């Protein structure tokens, strides 16, 4: 089981417009302590949009 203090936890990225959770990735907590935001393709919207880390 993954620890809550894991250095590279799994996170879910959700589209900012339609709120669909499209991507699962890992992030390094030491390098990115804040919420991650990436520009990814949203298959629901059909365009590239900002995806933020959801909790």
From Swiss-Prot:
It comes from the Bacteria. Keywords: Ribonucleoprotein, Ribosomal protein. Coiled coil: none annotated. One of its GO terms (cellular component) is ribonucleoprotein complex. PROSITE patterns: RIBOSOMAL_L33. NCBIfam families: PRK00504.1 (NF001764), PRK00595.1 (NF001860), rpmG_bact (TIGR01023). Belongs to the bacterial ribosomal protein bL33 family. HAMAP family: Ribosomal_bL33. This is Large ribosomal subunit protein bL33A. The gene is rpmG1.
């Amino acid at each position: 089981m993954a620890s809550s203090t894991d250095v590279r936890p799994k996170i879910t990225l959700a589209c900012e417009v339609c709120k669909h959770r499209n991507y699962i990735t890992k992030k390094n907590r030491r390098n990115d302590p804040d919420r991650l935001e990436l520009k990814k393709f949203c298959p629901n919207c059909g365009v590239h949009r900002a995806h933020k880390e959801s909790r």
